[in-house]
Amino acid sequence: MMKANELREKSAQQLNEQLLGLLRDQFNLRMQKATGQLGQSHLLSQVKRDIARVKTVLNQQAGK
């Protein structure tokens, strides 16, 4: 889990790279869930929230 304050210290390029990684993680978790291999279902919502945090910080930085 990431803190929004930690994310605000990163550049937009770093945030975009992190966002891509999180989206890949989310896709892999969804595929594991679909095939019945996902043992830790809480990871889906955790990654979803992390994606939202990164997008929020990116939008805040774009507005400045």
Swiss-Prot record:
Record's keyword terms, sorted: Ribonucleoprotein, Ribosomal protein
PROSITE patterns: RIBOSOMAL_L29
Any one GO CC term of the record: cytosolic large ribosomal subunit
Gene Ontology biological-process annotations: translation
GO molecular function: structural constituent of ribosome
Highest taxon of source: Bacteria
NCBIfam families (UniProt xref): L29
Family named by the database record: Belongs to the universal ribosomal protein uL29 family.
Protein name: Large ribosomal subunit protein uL29
Organism in which the protein naturally occurs: Pseudomonas putida (strain ATCC 47054 / DSM 6125 / CFBP 8728 / NCIMB 11950 / KT2440)
